[in-house]
Structures are given as C-alpha cells and as structure tokens.
Amino acid sequence: MSRGLGDVYKRQKLDNELNYNGNGCGALSADILLQPGETTTIAFVLGMKYDKEATAIMGRYKNPAITCQKELEELITFWSRRFANFQVKTPSPEFNTMINTWNAYNCFMTFIWSRAASFIYCGLRNGYGYRDTVQDIQGVIHLAPEMAADKIRFMLSAQVNNGGGLPLVKFTHNPGHEDTPDDASYVKETGHPAYRADDALWLFPTVYKYVAETGDLKFVDEVIPFANKEEGSVYEHLKRAIDFSIKRLGRHGMPAGLYADWNDCLRPVSYTHLRAHETLANL
C-alpha cells in the first residue's frame, strides 16, 4: 500500500484533482451501506459519448452483476483465443504467465496503440509513427497474423512513391491522396519537415517475418497504393525503399542518416540498409 492510498482512506473522499505529467493514477469511489452478510455490485462505466448514445449504453447496466459477469467472460474468451496461437510450457508457472499472458498482452497493446498514448506524448499524438508502427507489428505476427497483415498493408500504403515512409501517418490516412514531406502543407500539419532514412527499411524484417510465419508467399505480389500516387506490389514497395537509400548517400558512399530525432544518431542506417538487401534477396 502506498502512502498516498493510505491518505485517501483517512480522508474518506477523493480530491477530484488532475495530475498532469506526474505519476498519477485513476481512482473512483462510491458511498454504500451494507447490512451484515449483504453483498452488492457496483459498476463503473467509463467512456465518452453524446447523451443519446451514452443513455443507451448505460441502459445495458441496469443489472450490473449479471451484465458485468457476462462481459468479463466474453473478455476472457476473447483474450484466450488471441493467446492460443503461441503457448510455452516450462517448469515455472510464473515464467509461463509472463510469456503467455502479459508479454502477449503488451505486444497487442503496443500494436493497437502504436505508442500514440504514452507518458512521452502526454496521452496525445496526431498520428502513427512510421517505423514505430512497422516495428510493433512484429510482436503479434505469431499471435494474430491476419491483424498483422492488415497493418502491414496499411503501412505500405503510407510509403511515398519515392520509397520513403511518411514520418507521421495521420489517423485520417487516405492512400493515394496524401501530401508528403516534400509538400509545405504536410510539414505544417504534422510538424515533420523531412524524411527519415530508416522508416521504410523496417518494412523488410516485418514483411519477411510475416511471410516466414504464415508461408503466404503470394503476399509479396499483392498490389498496394503508395501514399501520394501510383501503386505497386509489396515487392515493388520494398525495392523502392532500397532505392530511396541508394539515392541518398553521404560523402563516403554510405546511406545518409537524414533527418533525425532524439536517439537517431545511434541507429546503424548502413547496417539496416544492408539487411534490407539481404531480406529482399531471400524473398
């Protein structure tokens, strides 16, 4: 028990304060009076809807004990099915739970949110980071290959026809009709003034792992639009990602780092480029 939680018990009420950018938590309370041996169920239903929709949703919880139990069972069934594709069995139950449940759950959450809600971004980000999202796909390929394939297609459609990836893929992404870092309108809307060297190069390990896991060799022949114009097969998208790097070499003939953020000076762009060639050859 933390000191703060002890203080809440002493006060017997919450302060209704907003803790911005601190180590906060969400807390809800209710005043109830129970007779000896009596039980009750309290359901906290959280969400944001307009009045009409909210009223309809709240109407489903007139009997919270039954409704919540039913939804809990549905939730357990949902995640059990998601985790079923990969299960490890070792002499350690704790290790099994960590790998089979919590690691898998964290991979799904990262895949779904793509770091769009975090301490770093104060709960807000105006789109998907390209390499972040492509990297995060790898964590669920073995658990939900169909979800992974859909997200790969989405990220391929956020690749510009010059081979580079959009540094930020808007939540309203419209394949074939997007502005790019070459356009002042994109820079103004997203705040990203240039391409990054390695964004599209992360497609290589992700696509390769998907094909290796599923055996779906035809995937590389699927035709997908580019972000701004034109379309091409998955294989063509990968080729253009390599071309993007080849056309942007430094004075020593190695792939240049281009625009960077907080730790990009540490990334081995040339090595990533080399691995991209190797992966394309294997495909």
Predicted regions located by residue number:
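Extended glycan-interaction surfaces of carbohydrate-active proteins
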Residues: N85-G127, I152-Y186, I242-R275
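Single conserved hydrophobic/aromatic residue that forms the stacking wall/gate
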Residues: M1-Y9, H273, L280-L283
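Intrinsically disordered, low-complexity acidic/polar segments
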Residues: D51-T55, E213, L283
